[in-house]
Amino acid sequence: MAADQGTFTTSVTLSPVEGSRTGGILPRRAFRRSCDRCHAQKIKCTGNKEVTARAPCQRCQQAGLRCVYSERCPKRKLRPSRAADLVSADPDPCLHMSSPPVPSQSLPLDVSESHSSNTSRQFLDPPDSYDWSWTSIGTDEAIDTDCWGLSQCDGGFSCQLEPTLPDLPSPFESTVEKAPLPPVSSDIARAASAQRELFDDLSAVSQELEAILLAVTVEWPKQEIWTRASPHSPTAFPERITQRRHNMWANWLTDLHVFSLDPIGMFFNASRRLLTVLRQQAHADCHQGTLDECLRTKNLFTAVHCYILNVRILTSISELLLSQIRRTQNSHMNPWEGSRSESPSRDDTSSTSGHSSVDTIPDFSEDLPIGELFSYVDPLTHALFSACTTLHVGVQLLRENEITLGVHSAQGIAASISMSGGPGEDIARTGATNSARCEEQPTTPAARVLFMFLSDEGASQEVKSAGSRGRTIAALRRCYEDIFSLARKHKYGMLRDLNNIPP
């Protein structure tokens, strides 16, 4: 019996246990305390309460499974000579890392209870004559080493057999992502490309208008935005009138700053480009499809945004013009009017002082062109007429943009502004009367959006009670009316003076 059993280093003999992989005899304490199923799930095994008697655990019995105990993995290396023998005995060193499952029915039950736990925890070196070779494994008991991760083993004896789950395909992976996109009709692709090009053009105009609005509302009030005319000092004026009238003329030109607004051309050009893009959008091919409708909606809101930017820019410019003209008008007098107010008649002035109103005119620059003569001689009239021209052109561009967007000519902002005064007042009133009779409603999507923008115009007669949009439109109407009213008064006075000039 002693020849068939393994010998412990502490001279304690255990009962033989049949190996699960071989028919040979293995030391009793070479097996785990837990069965393979409990060990894999890392839970406490209830079947091996006694050291030597390995009965099936309760979990395996309840599940109706076979309770198997495998060999422990050595915690220290064998002697080099014995390790070399084990490696050379089998070409696959990973199979020696742990013993195969042992049937619970083959475990001996006659081992005494006197074996201590300290002795069972020691690793036992079997004698050199012990045969570790295992018989060939049957086909039904073969283990897939790739599935259990044994193919990654490096042959070391510190490796422990741990069941690992195989790499399963992700449930989120689908072949739909790799499937080719459905073919798109050439008409749909052409219409979508045209709408995208229109959006790019509208975006470029929108960015330019936003930059102009920022300059008008933030930068222009902080710096000199008008071109100053350098008054030339008169040299032939008499001492008693020269100094006062020369100072008056210099202040005129310095404070009024002859009207020359450089960015106004940029603003008008941007408005014309917007009108061109809107006309292209109106004549673009329309395709009945979801994509085409979405692209058209995006272009619609971008176009309305550009139109609102035009309204706000024109409002800010008109406020700057009116404030500058009023400040200059209240501070100084026109040199021509000043000369006439000082003397009751031209003959009396010439007889008493020996000078006429021509003496109030400053010296002219030798390179002064004819086109700048009027602004040099009468800067107030020139500024008023320039402001009227600016507002007139701006309102015309607004009206054309409204018509292109589908707004009736008598229902837009341009019509409400023109009714307050200025050129084309009678035509605008006639159109407004006809529109009130017809009571036409907005027909295009853009017109409906602009109608929402103009919805509070009915309450914008009083600026304080109107909303932000109503305040903007009311301010534009007020500046338009005041500037044209000042221009008409000044024009009538100038014509009256011209008619009173003797030949």
UniProtKB/Swiss-Prot annotation:
Transcription factor that regulates the expression of the he gene cluster that mediates the biosynthesis of lovastatin (also known as mevinolin, mevacor or monacolin K), a hypolipidemic inhibitor of (3S)-hydroxymethylglutaryl-coenzyme A (HMG-CoA) reductase (HMGR). Residues 1-14, 350-359 have a biased composition (Polar residues). This is Transcriptional regulator LovE. PANTHER family: GLUCOSE TRANSPORT TRANSCRIPTION REGULATOR RGT1-RELATED-RELATED, MALTOSE FERMENTATION REGULATORY PROTEIN MAL13-RELATED. Residues 1-21, 89-124, 331-362 are annotated as: Disordered. It comes from Aspergillus terreus (strain NIH 2624 / FGSC A1156). Lovastatin acts as a hypolipidemic agent that works as inhibitor of (3S)-hydroxymethylglutaryl-coenzyme A (HMG-CoA) reductase (HMGR) which reduces HMG-CoA to mevalonate and is the key step in cholesterol biosynthesis. Lovastatin, simvastatin and related compounds are widely used to treat hypercholesteremia and reduce the risk of cardiovascular disease. Furthermore, statins such as lovastatin were found to be anticancer agents. The lineage of its organism: Eukaryota, Fungi, Dikarya, Ascomycota, Pezizomycotina. Induction: Highly expressed during the first day of culture on solid medium; thereafter levels decrease but remain high. Expressed at much lower levels in liquid culture. Its main location: nucleus. Disulfide bonds: none annotated. Gene3D superfamilies: Zn(2)-C6 fungal-type DNA-binding domain. Residues 339-349 have a biased composition (Basic and acidic residues).
